């Protein structure tokens, strides 16, 4: 009998395979509670992954043997249950096209509102608000995101600052080059202008001297030479005798 029992246990273990256990109620209370906690957490994680990866509306409701409630819903448990009831009633009485479109757009609107709410919560978390609902792991992830964001902002700021400095240095070199060019032009003009001014002064002086000398010569001639008509006798008194000179 013992050999037969041992062979039966071996056959049953072979049927279950490696790493598998027989699915039946766990009699030990402590083991049952530990298994419940592990399986519950795994089920909640799978429900979350399904809702995120497949964009599915998921609602999960769990009651423990003690009557404690555990739930998860990416939208809301009540809303998902109402949708379930409506889907069951629609299976009996199919809705019209208008009702189907209305239901579709309501679902899309609800999804958009949920996304907006998530974005608003994320924005509040970034500025340090509404942090009471976050656990340690979520706070750690938020801290890492903020540090990465600050690092990117600083890197971009430094990049713009370096570009601005390079532009100003280039502009300074251009202005210095233009300044040197203008100084060279001014120096060249200063070298050429004295020759031109000297030649113009010489020409003006020559013209002035020539004009003055001709005028002075004419005045000199007028002063040194008596006009001929003054030496000629007056034709009015030419026929009369001139009175003798009388000494008084």
UniProtKB/Swiss-Prot annotation:
Q: Which residues form the K-box domain?
A: 102-192
The UniProt entry, under SUPFAM superfamilies, shows: SRF-like
Localization recorded for this chain is: Nucleus
Q: Which GO terms describe its cellular component?
A: nucleus
* Function in brief: Probable transcription factor. Interacts genetically with TT16/AGL32 in a partially antagonistic manner during flower development. Is essential for the coordination of cell divisions in ovule, seed coat development and endosperm formation.
Give the taxonomic lineage as stored in the record. Eukaryota, Viridiplantae, Streptophyta, Embryophyta, Tracheophyta
Question: Source organism's superkingdom?
Answer: Eukaryota
Q: Which GO terms describe its molecular function?
A: DNA-binding transcription factor activity; protein dimerization activity; RNA polymerase II transcription regulatory region sequence-specific DNA binding
Give the UniProt keywords, A-Z.
Answer: Developmental protein, DNA-binding, Flowering, Growth regulation, Nucleus, Transcription, Transcription regulation
Supply the name of the protein.
Answer: Agamous-like MADS-box protein AGL1
Domain MADS-box residues, every copy:
18-72
**Mind listing the GO biological process terms from this record?**
flower development; positive regulation of transcription by RNA polymerase II
Q: Does the keyword Cell inner membrane apply?
A: no
**Record note on quaternary structure:** Interacts with AGL15 and AGL16.
User: Its gene?
Assistant: AGL1
């Amino acid at each position: 009998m013992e050999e037969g029992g041992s062979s039966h246990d071996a056959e049953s273990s072979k049927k279950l395979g490696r790493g598998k256990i027989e699915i039946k109620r766990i009699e030990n209370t402590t083991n049952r509670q530990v298994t419940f906690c592990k399986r519950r957490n795994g089920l909640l994680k799978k429900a979350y992954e399904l809702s995120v990866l497949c964009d599915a509306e998921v609602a999960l409701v769990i009651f423990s043997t003690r009557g404690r409630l555990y739930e998860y819903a990416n939208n809301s448990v009540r809303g998902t249950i109402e949708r379930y009831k409506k889907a069951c009633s629609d299976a009996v009485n199919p809705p019209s096209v208008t009702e189907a479109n209305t239901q579709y757009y309501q679902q899309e609107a609800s999804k958009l509102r949920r996304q907006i709410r998530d974005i608003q919560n994320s924005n509040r978390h970034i500025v340090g608000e509404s942090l009471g609902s976050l656990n340690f792991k979520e706070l750690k992830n938020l801290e890492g995101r903020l540090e990465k964001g600050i690092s990117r902002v600083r890197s971009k700021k430094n990049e713009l600052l370096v570009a601005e400095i390079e532009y100003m240095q280039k502009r300074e070199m251009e202005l210095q080059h233009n300044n040197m060019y203008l100084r060279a032009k001014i120096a060249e003009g200063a070298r050429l202008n004295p020759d031109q001014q000297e030649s113009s002064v010489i020409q003006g002086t020559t013209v002035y001297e020539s004009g003055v000398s001709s005028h002075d010569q004419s005045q000199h001639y007028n002063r040194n030479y008596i006009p001929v008509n003054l030496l000629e006798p007056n034709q009015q008194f030419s026929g009369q005798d001139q009175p003798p000179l009388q000494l008084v």
